[in-house]
Amino acid sequence: MNKWSRFKFTPNLPLGANGERVTGSKAHIELSKEAAKEGMVLLKNENNVLPLAAGSKVALFGKGTFDYVKGGGGSGDVTVAYIRNLYEGLKLQKEKISIFEELCDYYRNDIKKQYATGAVPGMTIEPDVPAELLSKAQAYTDTAIISICRYSGEGWDRKSVIDPNNKALWDYEREMTEKSAELFKDGDFCLSVKEKEMIDTVKASFKNVIVILNVGGMVDTSWFAYDDQIQSALLALQGGIEGGLAAAELLVGDGNPSGKTVDTFAKSLDDYPSTYNFHESRNYVDYTEDIYVGYRYFETIPGAAEKVVYPFGYGLSYTTFDVETVSAGVVNSNCTSETNKLYAKVRVTNTGKFSGKEVVQVYIAKPQGKLGKPAKELAAFEKTRELQPGESQLMILTWEINDMASYDDLGKVKKSAYVLEAGSYDIYVGTSVRDVTKADYSYILNHDVITEQLSAKLVPTSLPKRMLADGSYEALPQSEPVDTDYSAIGNIDPSLTEGVAPCQRAIPYFRFADGMAKNGSHDIMDVVEGRITLDEFVSELSIDELIHLLGGQPNTGVANTFGIGNMPEYGIPSVMTADGPAGVRIAPEVGICTTAFPCSTLLACTWNPDVLEAVGRAGGEELKENNLALWLTPAICIHRSPLCGRNFEYYSEDPFVTGKLAGAMVRGIQSNNVGATLKHFALNNKETNRKNSDSRVSERAAREIYLKAFEMIVKNDNPWAIMSSYNMINGYRASESEDLLTGILRDEWGYEGMVTTDWWTCGEHYKETKAGNDLKMGNGYPDRVKKAYDKGAISRSEMETSVKRILGLILKLD
């Protein structure tokens, strides 16, 4: 096939064997199910109620039995051929268990009626169970399964607040916020009144009670964790197209849960330090908890540990394991300090009666020193293979010594530097942040070591204070904020940010032709075939042609998130993008069903990079088969708060596990010669007023927590694209931040790929380009960029730099 033939939008050419399509194929759907099974977390299993014994009879309670949520809303939604709910999954286990059908008929009909009146999955009302049905269910069995579901999505958060001054709300954002507030008075972290009533009824009526959580993120688990009337609980999260079957197979013992939590589950929403200021202001969020996010807070701050129900890294199994640290130390004592690694050699033995997998986790306890540190930080992890009863596996986990350094933003040791402070770096090995044993070896430093000297970036001007390791706060320097709304060409018309489709050069299909006049004498194929360099090609383009390439292009083929390129007179194809984090998103009206994979948080709970790489590879195949070029995933913002409406499409509260697993996703996607897009860069931890909210954060917290996963993936996995976020960071729009997009991303990390805005940001296009944001989506503002050029506010050189990155991405495609 000739280069870029797919982007002519001839009929989509199948990638499978014997001319079969891989999109939505049985193999990809099976992969989705197996990935979901590997990530689901067994939270509780008293008296070994699970797995269900052969011949068991069960009664299914809760609207979630039928109101199954495969994934979140917005860009994370996927068009699929079907969705397998929990009931349907359990019905396929008919040779092992039987179900009280009359109760299921009641729930099915109720949910069907609610859908008919406009309800969406996960946002239905929990119905009352008739007393007669309850009595029949009791007579049928002593075992009940309760399913609790939750749905959230792009544009609204999980404790609903509508900003009356926000004129940029799309209709569905307002509607879903209002519906969530109606169903969950205290936010959907908590049970609704109707859910509480149903659960109390079930507990009083059945001997064995099992809970299934079909949710997208952190919820209240205290109601079952400490209740002796509830024996078992499975954190099933949002499992994609076959999520109901994945959960059902685990319930009957066709597979053994091996997932681990990637977030800390606290007793109350108020126990998270981010809660009190999440909705403090429509205009800003103060990240006063600083680096103490998730387990870094709960394991460090005095009194916080007792607030935890299920800790980070936690998960039970149907079997038991013995984890022994054989040895630990320096990998090679002859190495220079810049390349030294530490290791832990660990033996894992299956001591139970079921085959299964275990996750070995290594944490570092650093000296508090002058900077203060979390009590423990994840340094390495690895999942075993499937171990049979009595079988052992010897594992060697390694990590860079320099990765244990902390960033000094105030000059307590060395300003704007990563520092290893003198003292003992203790190694803890185990199966969760709490179930760990201290290794015999500690890494000792007798003096402070500067591992990397940088310069101040993203310095806050208005963050008043930040938390310290003892729970107190230190005041931070304040300065006069800069007027970031200034534009050399006047204010932006608000209509430009309201989702206007690309209208410049609206060419409906790609064609190799000379139908348009062009400024240059060469074709892009001259670059492909080595006759001229990319620099030479770009130097021949006119200003108008450069500006054209800086903006998004009309949809072609099956795309619905627009494309890039689109200059047929130069042979430059129009290559298309596609959402989203749980599968390739194609508009329903197109008629193509793709594979809905588990939500990102569930994939992260696998703690298995091989699974993430396989899912990425399959998704990349579906992208390519449908003539799409750039997948707008993975999304890797940190789970700062349970309230964020898009936590389901992000990975974890921990940047290390996020970076390792999302990096594997990137490798899988790009193995198909299509691009992955890291998003949202950065600190997009809130959906309410997301286009204007200012994330006020210390430079240390930004670097150590919120940028760290991006840094890991940029340095290790070479993503083709990065998407900047809507929000502001310390007074500057992320899409206009030279500190972020050039100073940190390119100068410090060495990134050479393309940066795109999120779709229809409120940023000024020319300022975004100057900052290092190469592409404005879904469309550019060519007239404003041209006006800025005419006034000298942006140079040709700055535009050429971005155009070369955009064309560089296109040139990677086959």
Each predicted region: which residue ranges?
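Glycoside hydrolase catalytic-domain context in secreted enzymes
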Residues: 1-435, 456-814
